[in-house]
Amino acid sequence: MTTRTIDNIRNFSIVAHIDHGKSTLADRLIQQTGTVALRDMSEQMLDSMDIERERGITIKANTVRLEYKAEDGQDYVLNLMDTPGHVDFAYEVSRSLAACEGSLLVVDASQGVEAQTLANVYQALDANHEIVPVLNKVDLPAAEPDRVKEQIEEVIGLDASEAVPISAKTGLNIEAVLEAIVKRLPPPKGDREAPLKALLVDSWYDVYLGVVVLVRIVDGVLKKGMTIRMMGADAAYGVDRIGVFRPKMADIGELGPGEVGFFTGSIKEVADTRVGDTITEDKRQTTQMLPGFKEVQAVVFCGLFPVDAADFENLRGAMGKLRLNDASFSYEMETSAALGFGFRCGFLGLLHLEIIQERLEREFNLDLISTAPSVVYRLMMRDGELKELHNPADMPDPMKIETVEEPWIRATILTPDDYLGGVLKLCQDRRGIQIDLNYVGKRAMVVYDLPLNEVVFDFYDRLKSISKGYASFDYHVSDYREGDLVKMSILVNAEPVDALSMLVHRTRAESRGRAMCEKLKDLIPRHLFQIPVQAAIGGKIIARETIRALSKDVTAKCYGGDISRKRKLLDKQKEGKKRMRQFGRVEIPQEAFIAALKMDD
């Protein structure tokens, strides 16, 4: 590599909405440049997890080095950074984009620009990227390349006259994409003689190598045997092995400025290698950290409990292993009277939550119950203390609380205008505040501020069903705002059930409580005594349903005879039921929990 100059390197990422053919295009580029022999090719080369392939999404950032001989006769090294497309992983996307100078914007020629395309393009523009638009799926009968070009110019403001029309599936025009990368994207800048400065793009745990760190070198050279320092985590390590991905790992001697590769060292914990950190040489340190490094904050919390209590230790081990690979996932132990021992886990968003739960169930064979997802509330106490509340069951006495603040998000929704009315109504029902409404061709772009609390429950599913699956949705957490929030407890037979308590807005508490009670009434089996199911705010009951008792016909053996004989038997039964109600325990089956937590509005 030392023979080639920095001018012959191109670092680029592919920006696209889910399902617009990003991973397929990556496959074609790998194939076209002969990086992988044809017999070793598989679909979605860069999506290494099964779950990534099945859901057709990219979760972890990946990278591959392509070597390409261009029409001008020169050899180029192209580093493709494959980024996650989903909003939960926006920070990973921003770090991957910071490691590149340019992006390919892939837009499906039949679908047009979607909400996440927008979010990711704006991130790429923030990173000062040169952007080459690519129209994918032009071989489909429904493709309308000219309309989509207009859309790109209108919505994003990019000149789409030179957009490259391709079909990643059939391999049409892939050569033109490679030429566009070489000609239209800028080479990296960097000083070989300066002290080492590198951006930590991603890291993961490998059973044999320990922690593998993916880096983009900005200045200086990374060599074997060097001692490096992570500036954000303030830890030093020796470098054992350096290499690049041709998707498989291949060792090389050193990485120079502008290059992307990996190194391994004596690193034990992925938590020490934080995405976005700056890496420098321990002896000759760089003075300035790279900008944009931040700690990843969990946004959504929920409890995960094993269905079988004997699995608790296995669950603890499984979480430790996942945490090795995904430092943005956090957990701590908690106990629940209803569900036993488990963990309170923090996630970047709902998709992240689903994926972690699915990976735990699939990779470690665990059966799990998850409690209702909740967000982090800030409580301003009367004594001036600021508390963070992760679990609604831990809410302190309301008399001690001055104000409750909840996180709000700025959501961008793109929808065909036929469904606009339904989408606006949904946002209004969820306490949304409309910020903006624009038309782009036949589609409306709506911007709303919404409380995250209203979105975590089932907002996405409702949005999809209202718009027949056509609306796309993207959000980022904007700020905390004061809200009139109250803790709603569910009481079964006058006993509070901790797993079902939740924080709700006062205006929606009654409807939420009534729905919950009705649902539980159908789910809890009848007992020999009457069971009240109540929703309460503090000491005030706001909704109640009663599960009727099963009763035995105690008078069946009396034929005729005196009425007082029957009355005696009935009174005796009544006494027994009363005593039973006082001391009886209500068994709430696990299915009832799972169904109650999946409650639709």
UniProtKB/Swiss-Prot annotation:
GO terms for biological process: positive regulation of translation. Required for accurate and efficient protein synthesis under certain stress conditions. May act as a fidelity factor of the translation reaction, by catalyzing a one-codon backward translocation of tRNAs on improperly translocated ribosomes. Back-translocation proceeds from a post-translocation (POST) complex to a pre-translocation (PRE) complex, thus giving elongation factor G a second chance to translocate the tRNAs correctly. Binds to ribosomes in a GTP-dependent manner. Its EC number is 3.6.5.n1. Residues 7-189 form the tr-type G domain. It catalyses: GTP + H2O = GDP + phosphate + H(+). This is Elongation factor 4. It is a peripheral membrane protein. Keywords: Cell inner membrane, Cell membrane, GTP-binding, Hydrolase, Membrane, Nucleotide-binding, Protein biosynthesis. The lineage of its organism: Bacteria, Pseudomonadati, Pseudomonadota, Alphaproteobacteria, Hyphomicrobiales. SUPFAM superfamilies: EF-G C-terminal domain-like, P-loop containing nucleoside triphosphate hydrolases. CDD domains: EF4_II, EF4_III, LepA, lepA_C. GTP binds at D19, H20, G21, K22, S23, T24, N136, K137, V138, D139. PANTHER family: TRANSLATION FACTOR GUF1 HOMOLOG, CHLOROPLASTIC, TRANSLATION FACTOR GUF1-RELATED. One of its GO terms (cellular component) is plasma membrane. Belongs to the TRAFAC class translation factor GTPase superfamily. Classic translation factor GTPase family. LepA subfamily. One of its GO terms (molecular function) is translation elongation factor activity. Transmembrane segments: none annotated. The gene is lepA. Pfam families: EFG_C (PF00679), GTP_EFTU (PF00009), GTP_EFTU_D2 (PF03144), LepA_C (PF06421). It is found in: Cell inner membrane. It comes from the Bacteria.
